[in-house]
């Protein structure tokens, strides 16, 4: 019971903070949220994808890299994020799509087998994105990656799924961090409208491609 109460307090704190942030931003009639601009070289890592292949971030130097942290056992937010990744890919033209790679990084060490991320890839239709990689590994391999990108993860009371930091990172072809997007899938406030995640991703992908 004690662990449940701790989890509930933490969950309510995170939710309240998120609501407070967006309410404050909208009440001040700020510009639509576009994400947080980042700088610096994206930390490299090597993990295993849903096909059992070793994959590192540096393998994709020369391409725009779009990656997010996902719970392989998630039933709510992560499948929605997956849908927006698929939609973002569909909105790219043929030339653009060849210059972009989409990755997911597992945050669930209780569902970290290759079979887990393969099953989730199929369930969320992420195999519709050519070159998609859902990366996983041991706790010892995953936790340093979470730390490098400021991702926190803790088990939900159901014992299977994980409450974790949401968001999508964009890295340019020189492996420089460009954007972190942590946003509701659509927010309206007065005259300002935050773009859906898929459209925001496409917007930033095209900006990065123009720069290179």
Predicted segment positions?
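Short extracytoplasmic
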Residues: 33-70
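Thiol-/selenol-based redox modules, centered on thioredoxin-like
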Residues: 156-212
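Extracytoplasmic
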Residues: 40-42, 60-64, 97-102, 129, ...
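Short active-site neighborhood of thiol/selenol oxidoreductases, capturing the structured segment around
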Residues: 55-85, 102-103
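N-terminal targeting signals for export/organelle localization
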Residues: 1-44, 48, 208-212
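Structural microenvironment flanking redox-active thiols in thiol-disulfide oxidoreductases
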Residues: 82-145
């Amino acid at each position: 019971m004690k662990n449940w109460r701790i989890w509930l307090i933490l969950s309510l704190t995170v939710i309240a903070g998120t609501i407070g942030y967006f309410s404050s931003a909208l009440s001040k009639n700020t510009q639509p949220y576009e994400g947080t601009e980042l700088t610096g070289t994206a930390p490299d890592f090597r993990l295993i994808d849903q096909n059992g292949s070793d994959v590192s971030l540096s393998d994709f130097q020369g391409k725009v890299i779009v990656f997010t942290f996902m719970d392989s056992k998630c039933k709510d937010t992560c499948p929605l994020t997956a849908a927006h990744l698929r939609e973002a890919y569909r909105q790219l033209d043929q030339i653009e799509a060849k210059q972009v790679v989409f990755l997911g990084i597992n945050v669930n060490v209780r569902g970290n087998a290759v079979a887990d991320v393969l099953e989730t890839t199929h369930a969320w239709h992420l195999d519709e994105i050519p070159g998609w990689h859902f990366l996983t590994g041991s706790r010892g391999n995953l936790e340093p990656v979470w730390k490098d990108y400021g991702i926190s993860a803790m088990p939900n009371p159901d014992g299977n799924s994980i409450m974790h930091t949401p968001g999508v990172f964009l890295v340019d072809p020189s492996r420089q961090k460009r954007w972190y997007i942590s946003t509701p899938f659509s927010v309206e406030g007065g005259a300002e409208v935050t773009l859906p995640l898929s459209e925001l991703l496409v917007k930033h992908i095209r900006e990065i491609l123009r720069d290179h």
